[in-house]
Structures are given as C-alpha cells and as structure tokens.
C-alpha cells in the first residue's frame, strides 16, 4: 500500500483534529506534524490536542501509526556540551507521542560545532541510547542530512555507523530525497542508488521518507527544498519512490514549499499518485 502525505500544521484551536482534517482533504493517508513551532521547544498540554475527536472522526483514514512527529530543529543531540538538554526534551516529546499513539519521531542528528566529527557521532549515539532507555514504543528515525555547515549524518557511512552502534529496533532511518541528493547521491540514477542502499543494507531500516525536490544541483550541500518537478531531481525520479514496492507501507512525507502563501500538497499528491514512473 502506498502511504503518501505531507507536513501539516498542528495549531490552535484544533491541533490533531485540524491536522487530520486537512490531510484527509488533501487525499493523504499519513501526515507529519511538529508538536510546536520547529524553532522552539515550547509545547501545549496534550489535553488540548483534541485527540478523542481525531480518533472518532479520522483514525480509520489516518491511523495513529501514520502520524509522524518531527523533533524541533534546535535540539542538538550530537553536541558534546548541549546534549543533556536535547535528551531531556526528547524524552518529554516521546511521552507526548505516546499519548496520541504516534510511532515515529524524525530527528535531525545535529552538528559537531566546535567538536570533532567523531566526537559528535559518538555523542549522538550516546544520546539516542539514553533516550531509548527512558522511553517506550516510539521509534527514533535519524534523518539523512545534506552536509550543510557542520551537520553530521550526511552520508550512508555515518548513518550505518549509528545503526550498528545503537543496535535497537526502536532506532531507524528517515530518508530525505533532497538531502541525500544535495549530499552527493544521484538518486536520478535510481537503480544505482538502490544498489548503494542495498550495499549498506539500509532498506530494512528506512521507516519514513521525506519526498522533496531540490533547488540546488547534485552535491551542493545546500538543503533547499523545491516543489515536486520544479527542481533538479524531477517528477520521474520522485514518483519512483512512491511506486516502488520496496517502499510500500512506509509513510512518504512531502515537505515542499508553499506557493502564493498556501500549500499545494493536494496537487503534488495527486501528481505523484497518477504518475507511473517509467
């Protein structure tokens, strides 16, 4: 089954109910939310989520398992000096996810800032292990990054290092098409890309996909998302992800820009579902 949806606003007054309603209107069967603004750690009480109303009206169309939560950008679990804040906050975030039954937390691995890359990779691993030990049920999906600035998690070697050091069924991967393209993986050569995935045995670990075109060329390390078929990747390649049987039942989430101050996820979902890749 194809699971296709988008990032959707989770906001007052309807929160989960409103997000699900908008997603269903877009003909989506999964969705991704932030439990607050991506740039802050400010959160409202779970009692405001309108969870019971969502369950009654939309849970058969978008199940709790298909509600992806994205951690805010500002936590840095790879920082040797700031990872304690990230750990404590993410434990609380997962507890909120437990309340609504959400299964996957997408997490940027962070950046090495003034420390070495290896120190930051190992700090991320230690942070995730501690978060997992203090929580239950939720799967942390490390997102593949574009290599902008001091980011870590920017290639399959680093992602594979995380997987093999953490070794936990509650740790997985979120594959972002714009990010890996900007990091230098030419996904337009789709079969070669799939072979690279298989070389690292990453396929069983991919639990979420972010499907975005890229405003910049291959290997640019920029991380600027483009609308579907408006960037350097193109519809033909992106549709292959949607229709690939290897990615059946994996939530595929659009994070594309708004056009004229409004989202066009409904149009992009329709385009991707109708385009049978060659």
Swiss-Prot record:
Signal peptide feature range: none
Nucleotide-binding listed as a keyword: no
Binding site for Zn(2+) 3: 179, 223, 225
Record-listed E.C. numbers: 3.1.21.2
InterPro entries (alphabetical): AP_endonuc_2 (IPR001719), AP_endonuc_F2_Zn_BS (IPR018246), Xyl_isomerase-like_sf (IPR036237), Xyl_isomerase-like_TIM-brl (IPR013022)
Pfam families in alphabetical order: AP_endonuc_2 (PF01261)
Cofactor note: Binds 3 Zn(2+) ions.
Swiss-Prot/TrEMBL keywords: DNA damage, DNA repair, Endonuclease, Hydrolase, Metal-binding, Nuclease, Zinc
GO function term, MF aspect, one: DNA-(apurinic or apyrimidinic site) endonuclease activity
Group of enzyme by EC: hydrolase
Catalytic reaction annotation: Endonucleolytic cleavage to 5'-phosphooligonucleotide end-products
Domain of life from the UniProt record: Bacteria
Keyword Phosphoprotein assigned: no
Gene3D superfamilies hit by this protein: Divalent-metal-dependent TIM barrel enzymes
One of the protein's GO biological processes: base-excision repair
Binding residue positions for Zn(2+) 2: 143, 176, 210, 255
Cofactor section: Zn(2+)
Function recorded in the entry: Endonuclease IV plays a role in DNA repair. It cleaves phosphodiester bonds at apurinic or apyrimidinic (AP) sites, generating a 3'-hydroxyl group and a 5'-terminal sugar phosphate.
Name by which UniProt lists this protein: Probable endonuclease 4
């Amino acid at each position: 089954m194809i699971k296709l949806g988008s990032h959707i606003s989770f906001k007052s007054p309807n929160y989960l109910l409103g997000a699900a309603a908008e997603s269903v209107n877009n003909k989506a069967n999964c969705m991704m939310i932030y439990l607050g603004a991506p740039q802050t750690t400010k959160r409202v009480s779970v009692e405001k989520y309108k969870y019971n109303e969502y369950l009654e009206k939309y849970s058969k169309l978008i199940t709790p398992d298909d509600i992806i939560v994205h951690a805010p950008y500002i936590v840095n679990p790879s920082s040797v000096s700031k990872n304690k804040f990230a750990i404590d906050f993410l434990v609380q975030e997962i507890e909120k996810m437990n309340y609504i039954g959400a299964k996957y937390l997408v997490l940027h691995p962070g950046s090495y800032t003034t420390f070495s890359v290896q120190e930051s990779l190992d700090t991320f691993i230690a942070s995730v292990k501690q978060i997992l030990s203090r929580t239950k049920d939720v799967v942390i999906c490390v997102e593949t990054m574009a290599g902008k600035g001091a980011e870590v998690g920017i290639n399959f070697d680093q992602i594979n290092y995380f997987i093999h050091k953490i070794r936990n069924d509650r740790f997985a991967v979120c594959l972002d098409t714009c990010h890996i393209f900007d990091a230098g993986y030419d996904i337009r050569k789709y079969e070669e890309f799939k072979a690279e995935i298989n070389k690292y045995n990453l396929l069983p670990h991919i639990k979420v996909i972010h499907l975005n075109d890229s405003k910049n060329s291959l290997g640019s390390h920029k991380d600027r998302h483009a609308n579907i078929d408006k960037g350097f990747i193109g519809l033909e390649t992106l549709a292959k992800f949607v229709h690939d049987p290897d990615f059946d039942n994996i939530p595929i989430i659009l994070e594309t820009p708004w056009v004229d101050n409004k989202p066009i996820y409904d149009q992009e979902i329709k385009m991707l579902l109708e385009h049978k890749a060659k």
